[in-house]
């Protein structure tokens, strides 16, 4: 195997969107073209019992939303495609944020009837901060939506990114006739037996259609006043190519996939803590754990650490360093994914995502290296939780299951765990309410441990250095606790309590996470 050639083939990207914009449906269609599934199931399959391939966890199937990031891989057109499907629900920003650290590009799915929505904006900010390319898919053209020019304007005004339309819709909703493909210089037809026609046939096909006249006017306007196409600007994350289509009816998706693969970047390097960048073509293997997922196979109560390979080649059975602990590990039981199904892998290269069977060795953010290399990659972001719950086992006899469940789910990073310094009570912190619901559901469903959860409301959280800690600092306005790494942390009732504490102890440094 020529490793350099293999690395060049890799295209690793995440799909981001607001809930219900059609992210899971487009993922399905891409897998369909990759030959991974025989028919694209859609999330609407709640009534029929056919669930989307990427929404594999029980609670996702019930709700029709993605709450974990799943990884899928397929080959298409000489490229090895790795898709990371991110949670579309706003409460799962931490997991999503980390996933976006492991990709080289992002596909942003927008509901053409709703335009840019809150969660899309939030996720886009993360992608923009990383400076990776964004490809936009304006979805649901089979329904009535906003004017295409207005949608492009929203990209520029709300997200602050220039856009270039790769194709243009001819009509919408019931009047939808197809796409005027500017990049490939052809028409893509929504109805009839023929899929494509030449631009010269446009007047013959749509001559009397008022929408087609509008399309020609719009394109003339774009040619005169629109942005210029620039591959350089796309790769720099300064220009987003825009594709129109309908994931549900599988229209425009294959054209999108083929064009995307032409312009999406090869695997990029990753920054170490000393600021140096590790090149994907370095011969030495390196990677980082961006996610840990328990119970991908509930029958075996397993846990998988998801690793983005940054450089070199993984070979089954290889020994790696874990600089965080100073110890080593052997990578013998390693898999690659198709949502819930997986297969053992013997080789993988930079750009690939592998799953390492984990018995408690790894943490999110861990760096893996080989040989004398003991460096670490820059730390992954963590979020400061905003709402808290006290949590305990409903049945004292189930304490063992309770502790195992908490330990595993907390290591995934979906909730954060704190322990009251004085009472030893467990407290959970989260960004949003849904995280608690998912935690409770999974504790009961996967660990057979019913839990009692009591709301503590919102808190303002600050970490302090262990050497600054004095237990007398604890008062009725705060709770002194330890996080899961045994670091001291204060949970303040409100901002007033925080300011009061800061005034009383001016020499104590209070640290806030992201």
From Swiss-Prot:
One GO term describing the cellular component: cytosol
SUPFAM superfamilies: EF-G C-terminal domain-like, P-loop containing nucleoside triphosphate hydrolases, Translation proteins
Places the protein is found: Cytoplasm
InterPro entries: EF-G-like_DII, EFG_III/V, G_TR_CS, P-loop_NTPase, PrfC, RF3_C, RF3_dom_3_sf, RF3_GTP-bd
Pfam families according to UniProt: EF-G_D2, GTP_EFTU, RF3_C
GO BP, one annotated term: regulation of translational termination
Protein keywords: Cytoplasm, GTP-binding, Nucleotide-binding, Protein biosynthesis
Chain ranges of the tr-type G domain: 8-268
Binding positions (GTP): 17-24, 85-89, 139-142
Purpose: Increases the formation of ribosomal termination complexes and stimulates activities of RF-1 and RF-2. It binds guanine nucleotides and has strong preference for UGA stop codons. It may interact directly with the ribosome. The stimulation of RF-1 and RF-2 is significantly reduced by GTP and GDP, but not by GMP.
Name by which UniProt lists this protein: Peptide chain release factor 3
Organism per entry: Streptococcus pneumoniae serotype 4 (strain ATCC BAA-334 / TIGR4)
């Amino acid at each position: 195997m020529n490793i350099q050639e293999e690395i060049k083939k890799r295209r690793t990207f995440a799909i981001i969107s607001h809930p219900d914009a059609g992210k899971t449906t487009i993922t399905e269609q891409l897998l369909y073209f990759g030959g991974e599934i025989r028919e694209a199931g859609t999330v609407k399959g709640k009534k029929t019992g056919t669930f989307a391939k990427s929404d594999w966890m029980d609670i996702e199937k019930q709700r029709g939303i993605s709450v974990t990031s799943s990884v899928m891989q397929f080959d298409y057109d000489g490229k090895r495609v790795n898709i990371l499907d991110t949670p579309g629900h706003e409460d799962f920003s931490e997991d999503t944020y980390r996933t976006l650290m492991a990709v080289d590009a992002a596909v942003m799915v927008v509901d053409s009837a709703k335009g840019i929505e809150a969660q899309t904006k939030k996720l886009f900010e993360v992608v923009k901060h990383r400076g990776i390319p964004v490809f936009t898919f304006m979805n649901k053209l089979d329904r009535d939506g906003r004017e295409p020019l207005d949608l492009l304007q929203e990209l520029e005004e709300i997200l602050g990114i220039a856009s270039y339309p790769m194709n243009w819709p001819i009509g919408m909703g019931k009047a939808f006739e197809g796409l005027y493909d500017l990049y490939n210089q052809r028409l893509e037809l929504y109805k009839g037996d023929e899929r494509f026609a030449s631009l010269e046939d446009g007047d013959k096909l749509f001559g009397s259609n008022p929408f087609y006249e509008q399309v020609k006017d719009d394109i003339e306007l774009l040619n005169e006043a629109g942005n210029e196409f620039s591959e350089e600007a796309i790769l720099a994350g300064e220009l987003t190519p825009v594709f129109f289509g309908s994931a549900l009816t599988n229209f425009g998706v294959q054209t999108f996939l083929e064009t995307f693969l032409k312009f999406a970047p090869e695997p990029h390097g990753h920054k170490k803590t000393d600021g140096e960048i590790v090149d994907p073509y370095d011969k030495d293997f390196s990677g980082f754990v961006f996610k840990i997922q328990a119970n991908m196979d509930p029958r075996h109560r397993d846990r998988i650490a998801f690793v983005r390979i940054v450089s070199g080649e993984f070979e089954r059975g290889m020994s790696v360093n874990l600089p965080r602990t100073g110890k080593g590990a052997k990578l013998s039981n390693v898999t690659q994914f198709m949502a819930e199904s997986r297969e053992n892998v013997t080789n993988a290269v930079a750009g690939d995502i592998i799953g390492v069977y984990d018995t408690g060795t790894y943490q999110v953010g861990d760096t893996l290296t080989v040989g004398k290399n003991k460096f670490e990659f820059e730390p992954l972001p963590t979020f400061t939780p905003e709402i808290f719950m006290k949590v305990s086992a409903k049945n004292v006899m189930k304490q063992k299951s309770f502790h195992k469940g908490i330990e595993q789910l907390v290591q995934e990073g979906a909730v954060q765990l704190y322990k009251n310094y004085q009472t030893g009570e467990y407290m959970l912190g989260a960004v949003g309410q849904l995280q608690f619901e998912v935690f409770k559901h999974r504790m009961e469903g996967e660990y057979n441990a019913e839990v009692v959860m009591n709301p503590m409301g919102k808190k303002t959280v600050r970490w302090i250095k262990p050497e600054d800690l004095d237990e007398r600092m604890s008062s009725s306005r705060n709770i002194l606790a330890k996080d899961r790494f045994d670091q001291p942390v204060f949970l303040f009732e409100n901002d007033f309590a925080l300011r009061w504490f800061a005034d009383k102890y001016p020499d104590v440094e209070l640290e806030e996470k992201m």
